[in-house]
Amino acid sequence: MKIAYNGSNCVFLIDDEQNCHCFSYTSEVAAIIDGKYVEYDGPQFYSRTSNKHKSMFRAQFGL
């Protein structure tokens, strides 16, 4: 899986099948990869992200 932050409040995730998913940064969806929060040169996702959003993210990417 690849992750890219475009600097415009949108984070693109490209899964192993090359499907692109877009998440709004402002919704504070946590990027949970290998159990860690992924930080970018710019804004980062915070651990205070709601459990609902975390669950949605995990379900979307099978984490």
Where do the model's predicted regions map?
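Terminal leader/tail segments of proteins
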Residues: M1-L63
